[in-house]
Amino acid sequence: MTIGVVGRKCGMTRIFTEEGVSIPVTVIEIEPNRVTQFKNEESDGYRAVQVTVGERRASRVSKAQAGHFAKANVAAGRTVMEFRLEEGDYQAGDLINAEIFQAGQLVDVTGQSKGKGFAGTIKRWNFRGQDNTHGNSVSHRVPGSIGQCQTPGRVFKGKKMSGHMGAERVTVQSLEVVRVDAERNLLLVKGAVPGATGGDVIVRPAVKA
């Protein structure tokens, strides 16, 4: 997989083309991604680059992590991410920023969706509600039957039921990079990306481009 970066979702806005067309965009701040380790086929069996982003107090870092960051001579970050690398070499301490992308490029954006707590089947799986009248009593939003009788005598795995909704890893594919602001380390991506404002997102070149 081609190298990507870890950024922070700043929110949504819109920009206008020269023809006056409004384009909804998500603003992603690409803080400098500091390389903490470069893995190669000789020592690790595969090629990858490990990066960290943001800052974290020394008291909040384990001794193992502190030693890892100290060996790379970089400040401790709030998260560590690894990207497979097909070509090119990086050294510990190198910085990766928004300039690796260009306007018009397609990217995949991964983030953690907003948590919605315990949700019923209508909200979680788009089930239709039952009749409001015609003899229905207190069963307007219930899912209905969840299986058969003695055969098979169980509920199949994967059955759509009520449960915790959101707060899971979500990837939106093939979003267009509308603008790259290298001076302010901002990436403007067409459309919406997963997660709440201020959340970490991973931006990679699109696998289906």
From Swiss-Prot:
One of its GO terms (cellular component) is cytosolic large ribosomal subunit. Methylated by PrmB. InterPro entries: Ribosomal_uL3 (IPR000597), Ribosomal_uL3_bac/org-type (IPR019927), Ribosomal_uL3_CS (IPR019926), Transl_B-barrel_sf (IPR009000). One of its GO terms (molecular function) is structural constituent of ribosome. Keywords: Methylation, Ribonucleoprotein, Ribosomal protein, RNA-binding, rRNA-binding. Belongs to the universal ribosomal protein uL3 family. One of the primary rRNA binding proteins, it binds directly near the 3'-end of the 23S rRNA, where it nucleates assembly of the 50S subunit. Part of the 50S ribosomal subunit. Forms a cluster with proteins L14 and L19. NCBIfam families: L3_bact. This is Large ribosomal subunit protein uL3. It comes from Ectopseudomonas mendocina (strain ymp). The gene is rplC.
